[in-house]
From Swiss-Prot:
It comes from Burkholderia ambifaria (strain ATCC BAA-244 / DSM 16087 / CCUG 44356 / LMG 19182 / AMMD) (Burkholderia cepacia (strain AMMD)). This is Chaperone protein DnaK. Residues 612-650 are annotated as: Disordered. Induction: By stress conditions e.g. heat shock. Acts as a chaperone. Gene3D superfamilies: 1.20.1270.10, 3.30.420.40, Actin, Chain A, domain 4, Substrate Binding Domain Of DNAk, Chain A, domain 1. It comes from the Bacteria. The modification Phosphothreonine is found at residue 200. HAMAP family: DnaK. Belongs to the heat shock protein 70 family. PROSITE patterns: HSP70_1, HSP70_2, HSP70_3.
Amino acid sequence: MGKIIGIDLGTTNSCVAIMEGNQVKVIENSEGTRTTPSIIAYMDDNEVLVGAPAKRQSVTNPRNTLFAVKRLIGRRFEEKEVQKDIGLMPYAIIKADNGDAWVEAHGEKLAPPQVSAEVLRKMKKTAEDYLGEPVTEAVITVPAYFNDSQRQATKDAGRIAGLEVKRIINEPTAAALAFGLDKAEKGDRKIAVYDLGGGTFDVSIIEIADVDGEMQFEVLSTNGDTFLGGEDFDQRIIDYIIGEFKKEQGVDLSKDVLALQRLKEAAEKAKIELSSSQQTEINLPYITADASGPKHLNLKITRAKLEALVEDLVERTIEPCRIAIKDAGVKVSDIDDVILVGGQTRMPKVQEKVKEFFGKDPRRDVNPDEAVAVGAAIQGQVLSGDRKDVLLLDVTPLSLGIETLGGVMTKMISKNTTIPTKHAQVYSTADDNQSAVTIKVFQGEREMAAGNKLLGEFNLEGIPPSPRGVPQIEVTFDIDANGILHVGAKDKATGKENKITIKANSGLTDAEIDQMIKDAEANAAEDHKLRELADSRNQGDALVHSTKKALTEYGDKLDAGEKEKIEAALKSLEDALKDTSADKAAIDAKVEELGQVSQKLGEKMYADMQAQQAGAAGAAGAAEGAAHAGGAQQAADDVVDAEFKEVKKD
């Protein structure tokens, strides 16, 4: 069996590594470098260039040289981030027939996984040249905040490149593996991995523990921004240069694709130089021409100017750090080490901001360009069975649940739950003699289901006719190690079952993930009010149902006046529940009123029960009715009412 290689498929650069025994080897490519630019050029003669050769010719072939394609992988064309990139990229971003964002080169439509596969193919060939044998299996890393769609697209890219992707793992987790196995420190440690790459930002809080000689890596929480990275820093420099040139020369370079490609190259170079110098000069002769002749660009940029241009981008990385610390249930002072990953973390301003937030200097002994590939190689060795002393426990980034009565999102699996995981909960019907239920599966952090992402729905049919609340329907959520969700529903009485797999292409887009979390925070108060209103309506519905049932059985034992009072209060509550504009206070008042006037009915029921000395089951049923009639809240043996619709049959 061949070796499982580890690949860091980056937005800007990619890297491949393997394990030789317990020693890691980051492999040099055919150009002699340990990282490869994630750039692909499609030439006139159908040749495809990858890496440094593609980068070298990009200025003369801007429309057919593709870079930062990882920002498009698994995305829909209509997303605002994609729309933003359309105006910035020299190559064409187009809408595919299925609504995804694709690219175009020489008039040919290309899917992002297809383009990324060229980079993976180069990584595969690099490993094969070193090993002298075919390579067919790989562990590929993705940003921790990548959604299922993006993960599946990355797996597809691997398959196109001729690789069986044994596992997709998160970049910060891979970096933690590389760090943890390289250090001699003993004892449990909590580390923060701050990963600012070319196109994405992630932060993960990870606990490294020594458990009976086995190194255990447990992700406590993760957060991030999947559209923030070095490309955005470059763009700030490009925009600044364009603005300055327009002021001086009166020419707008943003419409000139050849000039844009030269500016992109110069901006990246200037940014790198300013990490070690206080000032740099951008000198681009013959950048453009007009009626008066050729124009030359010459501009000095200081480190202070660059820091001013990108200050808000650096600041944007801090809020995810704050949320990750909170979600992990730790304090900043509990963090033993801060690991920097991604080339953009070489910027002094970034390091300064990280130190300011975490209160300690980040580690300098981790290579930010290679750590992720090294971690992927270690995981490959674990999966091949050659390494037994490492256990990796990762998490799911967003909560999963189903819609229940009143449109409430009832969470089955909370965000940052260790995967693989499985959870089951018993629900029931909302109407008498309901023969079918519809299970709606959602993902997100909002309290009301409508504010979250609908992943899918399915029916469970053939439920025997029963009063509402009697059938017991067990819903099971199961997330496997690859992050794929399986959902099942089973009628416990009949054993009838239905299952679906929520496939990756049903997952969230990264923009939706970011928006959900922002929405959840911004709308927390409104969500809470809606949740409380739904709870009041549910309580009112239950009281109406039980009071009607009690009146049918015991109403003739009441005085006419008492019965009329109950019926009037009952109608008043029903009217309030039908009124869509009724607020929580109005419904609660009607519930209280019906509870008060129903006390006599409850007393009659109780007296009748005592007199008859009914059997235990019958007594329990009557007591349940009395509790409802008296306005008490009923807890139905942990069975949650779920909002289900009748499935009509032809």
